[in-house]
Amino acid sequence: MQIKPIITYSGSCPLFRSLESQILNAIPLDTCEWRRTFQRPTKHVRLEAQAQQFNVAALEKYKQGDWSILEHPILHIFVTECNDVDTYKATIREAIDIWLKTLTSYGVSDWMILLVETLDMRKTKNFMPRTTVLDKIRLDFGTKNDDRCISVLNPAKFEQKSTESFRCLVQRIRFLMLTSYNRNIVKYEELIRSKREKRNIEGWDFRQYFFMQEDLALIFEKLELPTEALIQYDELDAMFSQFITHTGLNEKQQWLNHFRKPLDAFHGICLTRADKFEMRNKIRDEGVSLLEFRNYLFERQAYLLLTCNDIPEIAKRLLNFLFSTLREVELIKLECQEGALCCWEFVCALEVLQLCEQAMEPNELTCFQHCAPIWNLAKDKLYELGKLCGLLPGCTPTSEQLHIVVQLSSGIGDAPSEQHQFLQATPQLRDRSPNRKPKKSGAEQLKEALGSNQAFQKLYLELAELAISTYKHVTRLRSARLVGLDLGNFYCALNEPHKAVGFFTDLLRELKAENWHMLSSQTLLELANCYRKMGDSLAYTKTCSSISCCAELETLVRTFYFDEFLKSLKTLKTTLSAQPSIENANYCVLEDHFRILDIEVVNQKPIIQDDYILVQLKVESLYPRGVVAENVKLCYELEASSLELAMENVSLTASPSTVKAKDTSSRLKVSLQLVYKQDNRLHSAAVACDLPKSKQPVRRTSSTKRKLSPSVQADFTNFVQAENIALQPGVNLIEMKAKATRVGCWQFKQLCISMSSLEFLSEQLPFMPATFEISTKPASATLEFKTLIAGIVQPISLNVSGGSFIFPPDAKITLRCSKNLRIRQARNTDDEAAYNDDQSFESTLQVPLVQFKSFEERRIPLEVLTDMPGRKVSKHHEHHIALNCPWSRTELPIAVDFQPAMEATCRLHTCGTQKFLQVIMKGMEAHLLLQHAQVKCDVPGVQLLDLNPESQQPIEIYKSLTVTYLYEIQVEPLKTEHELPVVKVHFVIKYASLSQPDVWRTYGCAFDLVDYTTLFKLQAQLEPNELCRLRTVCNMNLKITKVHENPYTDLMYEVLNDQNLWAVCGRSAGVVSMKDVDSHSISLDVMPLSTGFLPMPSIRLSKYTAGGKSKTDGHSKVHPFPPGQVYNSTKSMQIHVIASVAGDQ
């Protein structure tokens, strides 16, 4: 069927025929913009055309209103080759006028006048006419439509020069065709609308209306507007369905008799039909059945959707198409053979599925979502046909059923001999592998499946697996489980229960998760039958146990399976020992057999470690008769602490010591929420209430995670238990107990009931787990003391807290002190002498804990004593006391810091050649008494003379008070400093505290005396000494005298004067050499700057080492003398300075 716009031609017909092929071939070479009316969106379309000679007959239908837009000419062209104005006026103008009047009389305004020019070069060189034929044509006929009058050079004679004019001609034809379409489509839509409004008038025929509106759809399709064409087919589909529905309401339509043909042939849709308009011609000429008409309508819609590259929409529309067609067949009561409609549905489903398989990508779920129910539909229809034809497992077709197969096979028909995809250039369709055989059509597969039981079973299993996998791919697990139920039943019919078990198990898990109790009970019966056939005693035992607890089943059924459960349970132990180890094989879900009603901790007092936990469990047995549980265990774990970053939740519930499990709906969970700022200040406070979520009857499987057997067993390290408990049907109270071994806040987690080789584990407790606390108070020992002072007895106390520890009769605490620290228990008032004796202090002390009870607290007074440090320390004196307690295997070290009671320092003083030692005692922290200070020196040749007065009374010393002792050091002249470089001096003194004035202890300190020999003596004299005036230069004579021989030959002197008192005139420093001389004199000029008694300018003497004596030592160095080697006799001298004039001060 050729669908191309018609262009008519008049005038010089041979001339147009010479140009026809070029014009018709050039029109579709490029797209053009179609600006539609009524503000419809602009489209880019590609036009094609066919040419016919002008005929008035087509315009007669147009005038009468009985015309088709496919057959109506879209453009009328008048062609002339007249290049002479006179000839035009004589003949051509009249012919054009008659032609235009004819078009106008039929209401046609889509015309064009084409002037084909033939240039005469000789005339154009000598004569140029004022008016051309084209100007005359436009003047006569194109005053308002001059764009419809076009001239073109004859391409046959002027091939090179005619290119531009020919291109303009083709563009003008495209434009006028689209302009004509705008006008004609609007008129045609009005015509369709008027026809549709007459649908209730007697004699109205839907078939005529169908072809009229389909012609419009074909025009849109030809213009490459498949969406617009699809709208027309959808309107026809909806209108036809509406007519059929009204027919069911006793509104009879005469034209429906054409579709009431018996369904002798029930071909399915064919999306690979070679001639897509074959059925259109059959509908027009012969008449078709309802199924054939519906097939053609869906095929046309599918073709347009393929053009739009919307294959998922085809799959989406298929089920609606099938169901609505079946309803229409039922409404108009068509006669058909049993199974015919199933065959038709099956072929249609497989045809669409094969198309989708070529276009589907694994990552695009849209098409899979629509294909999954189609696979399921094909599977169901095939099963119905198998049941009808005796092809199910275990059945043998009878002669009558074989006759049905023959009739159905003939009604299905054959697939088209040449299968070509009627949309050739579809980029989304994937090419098959060249080595892969093309799939058979749906009709061929159905015929093959109806031919034998093996082919039927193979196709059914393939369709079922495809349906399940597609449902799973689009995460429609419920639908996949239902398909698995059918597949499981099919495997059971095939006597292959081991393959059916997996599908039944998946379905059972889904049904239990969504609380379909009745359906899950029926599935359990199927599972029990499978396990019995398989000989799986363990699974059969567990399934029989679950069936006996199903309240939805009859009592006789439950009792039968309960007896089977007890019978199989006796032989289960030997069966399990013979089988290999299977993880969680003997676990059962407790909730399927028992219901936990309440868990209550019976202990009335706080549970202390090593005490017994008493728990009362209320559980309901769902068995029809009583059973004996060998062991009932309830484990508990440490409660997880929930910490919030932005808020602090403080629970307002009761004390956890007595916890009773309540229903979550009886008490609201109220909690206090405190929100703090960054500086720990309270920002806001609120009371929050967490409402329990209502139980959902149907939930997503991905969120429920219901399992047939518990996969995780909780940690049963801590549990309460009861043994040999008889559980009767209904509510049972079970008393359980266990010893509390670990402390903490505990929460019940899982219940385990053991019967023979089976263990029934709870998935989770049905209410908020009861919490209880096992508390313990750890025993502790601490030392309590204030500031401790070294050298005197200091009191400390040992505080022992028993906590929950059980003390043995011989319990004791051992205290071990560090070096120079001793300890004892506090004094006994009856033994004063032993108290004053320091020998009672020990480095290790054992304190017995006589009759010490749990939770008892005892304070034991102790005393410590440590030696006073002999030298000055910058920090406190640190010691350690290690506690060894009976409740701990490790020692507990405790740091003990002592402050010194006093400290001793010494200074060396020189007077000429005499040396004096000054010992300064400074009080620090204690109030003490001092007496009998002595200095000892064991070095021969050194003698210390005590210069202190003899005192009979002790001297008190306290903080910030100092006591000074002075001694003279005499060294024999022969004992030089080289022989005695260091003189060790020991200072010893007795001290006692005010609290114990009779107990005297010894404090000793050692000093090292170095550089104590006077090497040089420095003298200075100021002249004039008596008449020293202000701002008058005076002469200061310095004298350096060597007292003892020494290696220092070069000395440097410096005058360190106060700039406010003295000014040195000239050099203030210099170097003198004492080599081979005993003394050296220096004269300096100084000037007093102030009046009064001024101290003599200070003079410093230092060791001098000249530089440059070696390569490594290039600079001179100055080293100071120690204080004892240089005696400066000018330190205490003062000079009286008087004013030079009366006004100076």
UniProtKB/Swiss-Prot annotation:
It holds the Pfam family Ig_TRAPPC10. The gene is SIDL. GO terms for biological process: early endosome to Golgi transport; Golgi vesicle transport; intra-Golgi vesicle-mediated transport. GO terms for cellular component: cytosol; dendrite; Golgi apparatus; perikaryon; TRAPP complex; TRAPPII protein complex. Co-expressed with Shal in the nervous system. This is Trafficking protein particle complex subunit 10. It is found in: Golgi apparatus, cis-Golgi network; Cell projection, Dendrite; Perikaryon. May play a role in vesicular transport from endoplasmic reticulum to Golgi. Has a role in one of the several mechanisms underlying dendritic localization of Shal channels. It comes from Drosophila melanogaster. Part of the multisubunit TRAPP (transport protein particle) complex. Interacts with Shal (via C-terminal dendritic targeting motif).
